[in-house]
Amino acid sequence: IHIPHTWPGFWEKFYFKPGNLGFPIFETAYAKIGVYICYDRHFPECARLLALKGAEILFNPSATTAGKSQYLWQLEQPAQAVANGVFIGANNRVGLEKPWEFGRFYGSSYFVDPRGEIIVKGSEDKDEVVIADLNLDEIREVRDGWQFFRDLRPDMYTDLTRPGSS
């Protein structure tokens, strides 16, 4: 949905168009899942819309390099998991991209539970598959306890969609 334009190396606005398919939910044999890609994790509205549409597990495939992004990687998605009562699988690549070498991709893929706790985490420098057993009953337990969706006030958020509100 959102396209970054940052230095060094991420000049994606020149090569890609923003997505326009909205936030679809995919019903699998195991859970309802939603996907928001890389840069979209910086926009909490993406995770919120997926959760409001019924997603139980969100996935965020990313290719992000060390620096400030690494701090945000540990902060944003656990916060989104709590705010939306979902599991999140945050996956990031590792290594260098030759020949450009504009930064080290720091891996650190993880699963976070609806309470914001990281339940399994990958390494910073090895290609690997991160696997977790997710108890979907935790979603209902957390949502019933914290009631964030019940207490939403959409009537107070209209400025978010009004032209010129930024």
Question: PLM features: what roles do these ranges have?
Answer:
Residues 56-57, 87:
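Short, Asp-centered acidic motifs that coordinate Mg2+ and/or phosphate
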Residues 1-56, 66-79, 145:
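Active-site catalytic loop in hydrolytic enzyme cores
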Residues 18-20, 83, 104, 124:
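A generic fold-level signal
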Residues 75-76, 83-87, 93-96:
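Catalytic phosphate-donor-binding core of small-molecule kinases
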Residues 92-166:
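C-terminal beta-strand edge segments of enzyme domains
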Residues 61-63, 91-94:
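Short secondary-structure boundary segments
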